[in-house]
């Protein structure tokens, strides 16, 4: 099965209506394994089987069902896809060629590329036309109590 990743963002956010409790959330992007999904409620990462279960996947969309409380009024529920970077299929050097396995493996690679693109688009970046400037931050002890700022000549200070 070939999936169309181009128009599917690997991230969805829900805001639960005030006075309501919601336990079921659609996953409108394709995923392959239940472990491909991360579920956050108000910024807290939840644990699969402890806090939620997943249906669907195997290259299609699905649903996350909260097993305990779910999202309550005003809560923000964010579901992201984060496929583990690994090769799951090994093709034999001779014999029958499994085109279904090849398509699935290629779909996983495209989905991983979409995950990485989503993560990089959410990162602090320089424009393509900026001169080479380092955005490497100082060590944690040097950063403590500091604010990230930019000066008029060299950029980040």
Each PLM stretch: what is its role?
Residues 2-6, 60, 74-157:
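Non-transmembrane elongated oligomeric "stalk/shaft" segments that connect baseplates/barrels to distal
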Residues 32-34, 72, 86:
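A cross-taxa feature marking solvent-exposed loop/turn segments within ectodomains of secreted
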Residues 1-36, 43, 47:
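Short, intrinsically disordered N-terminal pre-domain segments
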Residues 36-70:
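Extracellular/luminal ectodomains and secreted, surface-exposed scaffolds of diverse proteins
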Residues 15-21, 53-61, 129, 152:
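Short, ordered beta-strand-loop transition motifs
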Residues 16, 70-71:
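Hydrophobic beta-strand core residues of beta-sandwich domains
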Residues 28-31, 43, 68-70, 81, ...:
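Non-cytosolic beta-sheet module surface loops
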